[in-house]
Amino acid sequence: MKFSDFPQAVIKENVDYTVKEITNVIKKYGPRESGNENCYAAQKHIKKEMDTFCDGTEFESYKMAPKAFLHFTKLVSVVIFLAIVACAILMYTSIITPLLAQCIVCGVVFVGLFITVMEFLFYKQFMDPLYKKIEAHNLMGVRKPRGEVKRRIVISGHIDAAYEWRHLYYGKKVPLMAIFMSWTIGGAIVSFILSVIAIVANFVDMGTFGDFMINYSYIFHFVTALGMVTLFMFVDFNTISPGANDNLTGTYA
């Protein structure tokens, strides 16, 4: 049955119910950081509703690190920023050579990009071992079929709320998320490529281009360093969003 085939009265009833319950959860249980008491209390509230139409509901406990997923943005931004600035100071005071400075920046940026890819692209729990674990809960409900089981349908949502993303919060009219993330990630990629070329140019004759890369490519790293400031400011861990769209809508859908 297509969505357009549902009677408008049924659609309105469900929309009104969803809006009412989402508002109720936000007002009654407040900030729902992953694994905290508010989140668990809200799950118990959902369980009471699910008990009315499910054949069975249960909680499953597990260990998780609430800040591990996005706290890497703080770590990566600080380390890359400090590496670029510190190496620049050490290089221009002749404490280290330009080649060593490029090698350090190249290695640090590579590690930063690797962590970003593992966490943000592949959703691997790469940084979790570095963070404190707490007990959290999954809530599951089951509706049994009338006949033979031929296919299982899994519907999921999450009732916890995300930390505030400043790029989105302050970018309602200007696409700050796209601008700053392009600057941050794009700058890091370009810095890595330039540092590799500059390192190679120290050992392979690349003519005027190689000389230019050796002498001037480090200047671009400062653009990357400034981009890391925006990455550091990306997540506000002191503010938890209401979580209406992400993801109470999915929970009540």
Indicate where each model-derived feature is located.
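Secretory-pathway/membrane protein signature
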Residues: M1-A253
